[in-house]
């Protein structure tokens, strides 16, 4: 510990603490431009200069650690004069175009000059000028080089946190520009974090350009509706219209960063295609009707249904999901309840809940990042959970840590990995079993996984020598026909590691914002809220469709889920629902599933409701209403209350009941959920008691010379489900789908990036452009599931697992 005196105030801090941080702990604010806590130290802007007793020269506080007995002055005349001079140097070239700059009103340079800057400049020379018109870098980013103050926040966050390394400095001195190599932006993730960290108006958002001033916006703190990382952000709205989404420094687990879909995926809220009126099918066609007529019809049909079921989206709030299962169980008398959950069966979802300890206490990702070894399996985390990717990359900068990634495709995070294993899709259970055997010193058999025994032994050695291990299990386990077995093999691996006295935790990587919350709330055929076992297991999604296909489902309630577009066998899903006696769909768009409904109820988007999400850590966070639902729509909670006769006045009332039913939530107060939220505190519950069945037969049968490629799917970095396709900005960034293959396959076939090919499976075929991904596993093809005009689920057949395809170069 070191005791220092700052402006006469004595404070004791940890050895090595920066003077800047010590001063802030003591209550003294020091201005900075180049410094940000999560970025590497630069010390270039010199705004943070302070005087240290006994030293002649002022020192940059952002790179200078305290020493015991040090005396520091941050506000004397010498420091103030130096600070004003630095601002004068910056203003010598900075254009004073504040009235037309989008950063006006929230510009750090503007604020610092007002507080500490000179009132008259010592410089009269002509200002440096790179261009007269701003440069449009992409559909989301505008660059004004004239305003840049060379703090290099943009360069460092792109390189160190995002991992894109799309930006760098060219030129020298005052002529330096922060830009991309030859302005190509080949590696840009379009996340907009350069916009967020820019202290001036050099990087700007094109969708927000000239739309508003910050003081005109009504700002609402909420949580991202896409993946389950649970990023916090702030919605800026004016006159009921969402104009931007931004993040706040060191706020939430995302710590100011957002991905492209989080920052730019909001325009679907104002889409012209939003549902604005209830509809009832009359004479074979949907027609607008009153709310009273629509709700009465739903009540009547479910009251008279012999067998009914409900499927809900994991993008709904905890409160909505809780009421949905309460409505289905208490009012409609059925346990046939499930969420999309990547359409896994109840045995697989139960295994995921059990193996990842979702009924136990939540585990913060920051604690998981403290592990000596991070093991990711079954997830394209860079695409499915981009901000989790950022957090893992930041942790991996510590070279004492080991990062092992196992996934068939090469992903961006591979650049930070110590070991990268490319296994054959569907063989996850074999790979994990082989790693466990190697850890236990047994013979390694990795038949059909395409991973060499030497690589498995190397990974096992790294795991065996680590004392603190974090395992991340991805959504591929929920997609895979062998997912349950793979999860149970992970459980066997954790037991083997724990038996040697090591600390190991398993966390899920989920691709829907409230998937964990859906299970916590009892939207599951086996579990009630709080993971109490239901009296008689109900049907999961697949079983509901099976029953419906045989004419055995009288009424189906589908809330926020597009079953036809997303279920892995579109033809079967459509055919099954066509035989249901009655279908009600509650959604914000007229999806393919909604088009089949007998009644359609228009609900609300995440920006139009209050409630909570529970992210993949088990962190409960508030979402807050920023605007009213579009004219004619109603909040989902309101609709459920009307159907069930519930008398809750607000989401907080429902949450109070959740606390009684789900013990892990009992100590959480709805109105006190600010900042980083609260981790659930449950108790260990053994749920499955299942044993893995090594289904090598399914993997071995995958060999097929006629269809040599295994086709896998998932989310693209710029999209999540079909929802983000309604955001025009994201659609502009990735306007059309593609098929991705490995560099080895492309070389053998004589195919290059951009070539048109036909992807032909047993049940479907499409024409797409090729993207070549060097480092991916040979024999694996990938098509994102996000494109409405290319329904990749048509390639799948229920019960057959991973489809096989052939790729034919178009002439």
Q: Where are these predicted regions, by residue range?
A:
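Short, structural beta-strand-to-alpha-helix junction motif
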Residues: 3, 17-21, 317, 424, ...
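Short beta-alpha connecting loops at secondary-structure transitions
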Residues: 5, 68-74, 180-181, 219, ...
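Structural motif
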Residues: 6, 52-54, 761
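A basic, amphipathic helix-loop patch mediating RNA/tRNA/ribosome contacts
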Residues: 19-53
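Fe-S ferredoxin-like electron-transfer domains
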Residues: 46-225, 229-233, 238-242
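Catalytic alpha/large subunits of respiratory electron-transfer oxidoreductases
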Residues: 91, 95, 151, 156, ...
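Long, contiguous, secondary-structure-rich segments that constitute the structural scaffold
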Residues: 442, 450, 624-680, 724-740, ...
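Long, low-complexity segments enriched in small/aliphatic residues
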Residues: 487-491, 655-733
């Amino acid at each position: 510990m070191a005791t220092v005196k700052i402006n006469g105030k004595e404070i004791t801090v940890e050895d090595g603490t920066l003077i800047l941080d010590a001063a802030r702990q003591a209550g003294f604010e020091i201005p900075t431009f180049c410094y940000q806590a999560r970025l590497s130290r630069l010390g270039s802007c010199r705004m943070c200069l302070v005087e240290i007793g006994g030293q002649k020269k002022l020192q940059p506080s952002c790179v200078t650690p305290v020493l015991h007995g040090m005396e520091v002055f941050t506000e004397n005349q010498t420091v103030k004069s130096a600070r004003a001079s630095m601002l004068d140097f910056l203003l010598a070239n900075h254009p004073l175009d504040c009235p037309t700059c989008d950063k006006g009103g929230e510009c750090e340079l503007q604020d610092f000059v007002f507080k500490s800057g000179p009132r008259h400049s010592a410089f009269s020379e002509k200002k440096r000028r790179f261009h007269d018109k701003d440069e449009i870098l992409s559909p989301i980013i505008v660059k004004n080089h004239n305003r840049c103050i060379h703090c290099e926040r943009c360069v460092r966050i792109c390189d160190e946190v995002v991992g894109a390394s799309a930006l760098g400095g060219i030129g020298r001195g005052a002529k330096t520009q922060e830009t991309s190599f030859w302005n190509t932006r080949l590696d840009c993730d379009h996340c907009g974090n350069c916009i967020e960290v820019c202290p001036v108006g050099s990087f700007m958002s094109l969708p927000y350009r000239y739309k508003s001033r910050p003081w005109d916006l009504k700002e609402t703190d909420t949580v991202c509706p896409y993946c389950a990382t649970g990023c916090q952000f702030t919605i800026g709205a004016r006159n009921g219209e969402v104009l931007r989404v931004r993040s706040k420094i060191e706020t939430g687990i995302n710590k100011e960063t957002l991905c492209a879909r989080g920052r730019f995926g909001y325009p679907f809220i104002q889409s012209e295609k939003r549902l604005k009126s209830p509809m009832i099918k009359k004479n074979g066609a949907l027609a607008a009707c009153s709310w009273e007529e629509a709700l009465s019809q739903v009540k009547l049909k479910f009251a008279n249904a012999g067998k009914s079921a409900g499927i809900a989206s994991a993008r709904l709030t905890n409160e909505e999901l809780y009421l949905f299962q309460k409505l289905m169980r208490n009012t409609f008398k059925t346990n046939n309840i499930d969420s999309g959950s990547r359409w896994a069966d109840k045995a697989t979802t139960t295994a995921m809940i059990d193996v990842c300890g979702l009924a136990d206490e939540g585990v913060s990702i920051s604690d998981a990042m403290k592990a000596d070894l991070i093991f990711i399996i079954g997830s394209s985390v860079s695409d499915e959970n981009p901000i989790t990717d950022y957090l893992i990359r930041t942790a991996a900068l510590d070279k004492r840590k080991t990062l092992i990634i196992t996934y068939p495709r090469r992903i961006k995070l591979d650049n930070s990995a110590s070991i990268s294993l490319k296994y054959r899709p569907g063989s996850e259970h074999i790979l994990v079993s082989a790693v466990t055997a190697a850890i236990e010193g047994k013979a390694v058999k990795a038949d059909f996984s395409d991973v060499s025994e030497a690589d498995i032994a190397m990974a096992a050695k790294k795991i065996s020598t680590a004392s603190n291990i974090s395992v991340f299990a991805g959504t591929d386990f929920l997609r895979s026909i062998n997912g349950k077995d793979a999860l149970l093999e992970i459980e066997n691996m954790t037991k083997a590691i724990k038996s040697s006295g090591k600390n190991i935790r398993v966390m899920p990587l989920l691709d829907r914002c409230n998937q964990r919350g859906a299970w916590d709330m009892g939207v599951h055929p086996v579990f009630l809220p709080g993971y109490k076992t239901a009296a008689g297991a109900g049907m999961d999604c697949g079983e509901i469709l099976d029953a419906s296909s045989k004419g055995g489902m009288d009424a189906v309630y589908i809330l926020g889920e597009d079953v036809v577009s997303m279920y892995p066998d579109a033809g079967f899903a459509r055919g099954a629902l066509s035989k249901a006696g009655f279908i009600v769909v509650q959604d914000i768009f007229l999806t393919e599933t909604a088009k089949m409904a007998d009644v359609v109820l228009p609900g609300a988007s995440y920006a139009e409701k209050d409630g909570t999400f529970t992210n993949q850590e088990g962190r409960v966070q508030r979402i807050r209403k920023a605007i009213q639902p579009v004219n004619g729509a109603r909040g989902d909670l309101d609709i459920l209350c009307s159907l069930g006769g519930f008398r809750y006045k607000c989401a907080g009332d429902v949450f109070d009941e959740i606390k009684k039913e789900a013990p892990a939530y009992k100590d959480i107060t709805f109105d006190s959920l600010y900042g980083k939220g609260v981790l659930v505190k449950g108790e260990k519950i053994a749920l499955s008691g299942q044993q893995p069945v090594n289904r090598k037969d399914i993997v071995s049968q995958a060999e097929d010379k006629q269809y040599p490629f295994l086709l896998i799917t998932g989310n693209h970095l710029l999209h999540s489900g079909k929802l983000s396709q309604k955001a025009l900005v994201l659609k502009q960034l990735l306007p059309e789908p593609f098929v991705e293959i490995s560099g080895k396959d492309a070389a053998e076939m004589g195919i290059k990036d951009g070539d048109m090919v036909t992807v032909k499976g047993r049940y479907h075929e499409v024409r797409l452009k090729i993207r070549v991904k060097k480092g991916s596993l040979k024999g694996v093809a990938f098509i994102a599931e996000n494109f409405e005009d290319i329904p990749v689920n048509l390639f799948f057949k229920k019960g057959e697992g991973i489809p096989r395809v052939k790729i034919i170069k178009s002439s």
